[in-house]
């Protein structure tokens, strides 16, 4: 389908000097595949079905996409636009700012090869490269991805995001950073609408007090609850304590972690290590107090002593052990 010129204040054509194009100047507008494009001036290459446009570039595709920039090369045979300058793409769901957009009007996919910024509701997303599929409101971000939100920031290598469902998918090393903790994973998803997430591959939660690791991690931000599965480790570097297990439940508001499924505790002293087994361990921290609880069927041993009981409480603050 040929590019249709809708308007130009002045049109220049000279078959002897430049037989392959027309020069269009002033309030230029043209139509192709239901997209209206406007600019200050343009070259219309009739045989190639191509336009080179300059000035205040604007592309309107129905009521879904508006794209502005300073220079446009439009390839009519391929239905592709290359827009450069201060480029802004706007639809109902987001705004993209960058210095170059490659836009396919057939597939409605826009990509940017250089640094871009997405503004979506209360989030700002930056990445070196990215693409946006407007039909399904889906983004792909690559290289140095940074998400800035009022409650948390995300740093990752590769990320997919759908602005309709508001679900984010992570690929590669990823950090979710908030005021009091950092969550790490190498694969997973986060629903920013419900604040529910599932993280996989070398996952951990890190706070000032401890590191909680596992093969996978379920997290509900609204309930301040997390659950780690398989190869679980609770590492308290301040107290030189590590608790191993199969499952760990994390209660953020209560500052409590419950570790179960064949758990074992290691407590390092200056010249020795205390080992302890029980059905489950509970690590709890309150203002001025930090405790580890073990129950039931507690057994423990160290080089110079060993013992067993039904339940045990150890207070790190005053080093008091209570057995029941």
Regions from the PLM with identified roles:
Residues 1-324:
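N-terminal amphipathic/hydrophobic interface segments
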């Amino acid at each position: 389908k040929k590019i249709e010129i809708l308007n130009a204040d002045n049109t220049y054509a000279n078959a002897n000097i430049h037989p392959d194009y027309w020069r269009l100047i002033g309030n230029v507008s043209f139509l192709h595949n239901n997209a209206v494009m406007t600019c200050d001036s343009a070259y219309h290459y009739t045989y190639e079905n191509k336009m080179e446009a300059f000035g205040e570039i604007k592309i309107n595709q129905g009521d879904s996409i508006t794209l502005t920039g300073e220079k446009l090369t439009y390839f009519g045979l391929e239905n592709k636009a290359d827009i450069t300058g201060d480029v802004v793409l706007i639809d109902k769901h987001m705004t993209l700012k960058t210095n170059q957009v490659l836009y396919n009007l057939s597939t409605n996919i826009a990509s940017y090869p250089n640094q871009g910024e997405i503004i979506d509701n209360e989030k700002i997303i930056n990445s070196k490269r990215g693409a946006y599929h407007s039909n399904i409101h889906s983004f792909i971000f690559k290289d140095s991805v940074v998400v800035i939100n009022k409650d948390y920031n995300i740093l990752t290598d590769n990320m997919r995001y759908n602005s309709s469902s508001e679900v984010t998918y992570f690929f590669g090393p990823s950090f979710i950073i908030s005021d009091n903790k950092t969550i790490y994973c190498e694969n997973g998803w986060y629903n920013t609408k419900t604040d529910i997430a599932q993280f996989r591959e070398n996952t951990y939660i890190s706070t000032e007090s401890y590191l909680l690791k596992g093969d996978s991690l379920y997290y509900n931000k609204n309930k301040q609850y997390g659950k780690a599965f398989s190869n679980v480790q609770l590492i308290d570097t301040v107290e030189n304590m590590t608790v191993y297990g199969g499952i760990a439940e994390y209660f953020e508001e209560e500052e409590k972690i419950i570790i179960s499924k064949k758990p074992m505790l290691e407590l390092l002293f200056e010249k020795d290590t205390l080992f302890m087994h029980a059905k489950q361990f509970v690590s709890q921290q309150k203002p001025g107090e930090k405790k580890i609880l073990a129950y039931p069927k507690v057994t423990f041993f160290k080089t110079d002593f060993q013992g067993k009981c039904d339940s045990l409480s150890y207070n790190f603050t005053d080093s008091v052990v209570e057995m029941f």
